[in-house]
Structure formats: C-alpha cells, structure tokens
Amino acid sequence: SVIIDAVGKIGNGEVEINRITKTVLVIDEAQDMTEDEFALVEALIRKNEDLKVVAVGDDDQNIYSFRRSNSRYMRKLVDEYGARTHDLLVNFRSKKCLVEFANRFWETIPERMKQSRIISHDQDEGEIRIVQYQSPNMVIPLVQDICATPLIGTTCVLTQTNWEAIQVACLLKDKRMPVRLIQSNEGFRLCDMDEMRFFNRILGSQAEVHLIDEVCWAEAKQAIKNEYCEAASWEICRGIIQNFEQLYPCKYRSDWETYLFESKLEDFYAVRGETIVVSTIHKAKGKEFDNVFLLLNDNRDLLGDNQPVTDEKRREIYVALTRAKNKLSIHLN
C-alpha cells in the first residue's frame, strides 16, 4: 500500500528530509489507527526529534476492527512515548439522562483509557424508552412506533446491518414518511461517480496547471448543476463541492484530487428536520440527531443471557447511544 511504501522509503532515507520535516503532527480519530498508519507516525517521530504529536481520539468509539484499526496504537503513544492525556469530560450534545445512561453502559466496556465519567453540560432531562420484544420480528413494530411518535427536530433510525436499514427505510417510505437511507461508497471513490467525472471534465485536467482558475471552477459548478439538478444525487454533489470550497479558499488541483480520494459519501448527506434518516451505526459515527431510534435485534447478551458479546459490539452500541441529543428509543429482544 501507499503507507507501507512511504514507511519503507522514510526508513531507508529515500525521502528528502525537507519533505518530512514537521513541527506538529495532529492525528484525528486516533483510536482508528491501523498498524501501518501507526508505523508511519513512528517513522515521522524518529525523523523529527522535536516533533509535537497531538492525538485526538476516543477509544470507546473504536468500531472499525474490520478495517484492522485498533485503539492500542493510540495507547502506545502514552505507554511507549510518554504522551500526556487530557480527558475532555463535558458533553455539549446530549440531555442529562442520556449522558448518564451512556455512562452506565460504558462501565461494561473493559480496558478503557478514560476512567472519569462524562458530565452533561445540559442539565435538562431528556427521554429514554426501552421497548423489549419476545421475537426477532421487530422491524414492523419499530416502524409503527416511529410513525406514532411526535417528532421534533432531526430523527435517525440506527440499525446494525445494511439489510435492516433497507427494510426500515422501505417500510417508512411505504407509510409515506419522508426518509433518507444513508449509503456508503465502499468499493469506489467519489472521483468515480459519474457526476464527479462530469465535473472534472468541465474543469479540465491540464497537469501543468496547479491552481484551479476561479472562472473555470464557477463554470464547472454551473454545468454540473444544469446537468444533475433534478437527479437524486444533486444534493450530495453540491455538498461535496461546497465543503471543498470551505476547506480550501485557494483551490489547488492536488488538494481537490486528494479530497475526492479520501472523502466518504456518508459525510455529505444533508440532515433535514422533516426527513427521517436511516443508517447503520457505523455510518452514523460522528453525527448527532435530536431523536434516535436504535434497533438491537437478537442482542440477548445485553439482557443477561449467556450469549457472549464482544468488546467491539459494546463499543458499537455505545456509539449508537451517544448519537441522541434529546430522545432515545431502544428496541431490543
């Protein structure tokens, strides 16, 4: 991979020192580092004696082990490099009872880096409902409950699998509820979208031109709007372009290409109050909603049965619980 090759070249002295001389290295979502990514961090540390490393992360939210990520690499910065830890303990998102509920749940997660409880900035009480089923047939009653619940603000239904998310979205649509299914771009890059290919063709691809001309950019924006404004994908395309404009006032072609390569489709779904968002827990990480309905089908282990539960699954559920701002409704069997 690119990262492994980079680590090898840095270690062998094949990279010009000015290309890797850094003063500060900031690692966001540090709990999701893989072995290769941590090897790159270590290579940069070895080549920069005075390098300051700032790692921002929450080991309770490491839910991407299927991508070989592990929070132990963030912990290594403390254990092997003597990094100091600063716990950010005030929650500005959720109502008081939701924060307390999440606190009680994370007590079941072993070997956590944080030991102090989270404190809610908002002292108003929210609402928690737990609906227990005796059957695995939970999707239809869940949808009925959603339709019968007065909803104010943004709403999301969280599921554990894509198939559950599709079922919920289809049933809500059948009930004539405004719904949006969050999908991901696993298996392809945003630059491979037909809409982005069209945009890039209008933009031009002269390799010798590093800075994108503002006139060309505006023409490409107008062209993609004219071509796709009636398409279901237009809102996502507009979000991709607008977000890049906010991040990069000076539009370099290399920045645009890297941005399309690294961005995830689920980051550009607009959330409107009247639309019910349906998503797997993994795709909703980093997002927040006023109302959250959580479908936990067949997690009998949480009810005290003998079926084992992994730490990964507990962290996944913790992530789901902490998406809610005001109301949390858990449907489980």
Q: Which residues are covered by each model-predicted region?
A:
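Amphipathic alpha-helical interaction segments
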Residues: 2-5, 167, 236-239
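Conserved helicase/translocase P-loop NTPase motor core
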Residues: 1-25, 33-43, 48, 257-280
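Conserved helicase motor core of SF1/SF2 NTP-dependent helicases
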Residues: 24, 31-124, 134, 141, ...
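Conserved helicase C-terminal RecA-like lobe
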Residues: 199-331
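RNase H-like two-metal-ion nuclease catalytic core shared by retroviral integrases
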Residues: 186-200
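Short amphipathic alpha-helix with an adjacent loop that forms part of the alpha/beta core around
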Residues: 11-19, 139-149
